[in-house]
């Protein structure tokens, strides 16, 4: 087959593909239109719910109610979407509807890119105002002062147990725990240097250093260990210095 014939055959295949896809895309567009109408109706009902909550002085965010909805979504899901995918979609729907009732500001231990930010978005969805704080104390102060509606802080991990500073702050303030989320955490030793022997110091949050101490003792005993405010800050510092990881 000549090159010209191959090109003609390919063009014909593309034409046939487009003929089959076109009606399916029209159907998808119609389903999208219906979804938008239904989501708008849901948002309108959420506004009505918000008015009732405001009348009775109730909180807009009810994590137990949202958890019930996500559980119900999994129960009535006929497929082919997997439950975790459908629940992720519904989390964002609820987050967007909640935002038109009241815009929540959520403080977390920053900067951006920390596990705390990840937990915040997994719990509240993306339709919130994020407030990154330099310390756990700042998170608590932001909520107490009314600058943030909620705060997200680490309270325990499976390898090192409870985070003592978080527990102290819970005892010293009148703030209460209103919800919880567990997220998997994996650490990696990263550096711009391609030779580990050239790296002199490893930076990380104190909890991360404690969690990784056995691995570091075996694989990188020569590295000095320095605690910093967050793993995200450690990554930022290491990204510009080949002697850091």
Model-derived features: where do they sit?
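Domain-level signature for soluble enzymes in the chorismate/prephenate branch of the shikimate pathway
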Residues: 1-245
């Amino acid at each position: 087959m000549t090159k010209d014939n191959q090109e003609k055959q390919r063009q014909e295949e593309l034409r046939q593909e487009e003929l089959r896809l076109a009606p399916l895309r029209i159907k998808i567009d119609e389903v999208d239109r219906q979804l938008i109408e239904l989501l708008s109706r849901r948002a309108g009902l959420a506004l009505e719910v918000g008015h009732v909550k405001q009348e009775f002085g109730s909180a807009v965010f009810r994590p137990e109610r949202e958890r019930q909805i996500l559980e119900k979504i999994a129960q009535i899901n006929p497929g082919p979407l997997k439950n975790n995918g459908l629940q992720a979609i519904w989390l964002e729907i609820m987050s967007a509807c909640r935002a038109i009732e009241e815009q929540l500001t959520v403080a977390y231990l920053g900067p951006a890119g920390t596990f705390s930010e990840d937990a915040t978005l997994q719990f509240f969805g993306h339709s919130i105002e994020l407030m990154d704080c330099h310390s756990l104390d700042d998170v608590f102060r932001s909520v107490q002062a009314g600058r943030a509606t909620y705060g997200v802080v680490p309270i325990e991990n499976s390898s090192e147990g409870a985070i003592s500073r978080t527990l102290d702050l819970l005892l010293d303030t009148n703030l209460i725990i209103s919800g919880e989320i567990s997220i998997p955490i994996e650490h990696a030793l990263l550096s711009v240097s391609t030779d580990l022997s050239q790296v002199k110091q490893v930076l990380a949050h104190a909890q991360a250093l404690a969690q990784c101490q056995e691995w570091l003792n075996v694989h990188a005993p020569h590295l000095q260990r320095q605690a910093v405010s967050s793993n995200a800050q450690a990554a930022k510092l290491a990204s510009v210095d080949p002697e850091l990881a």
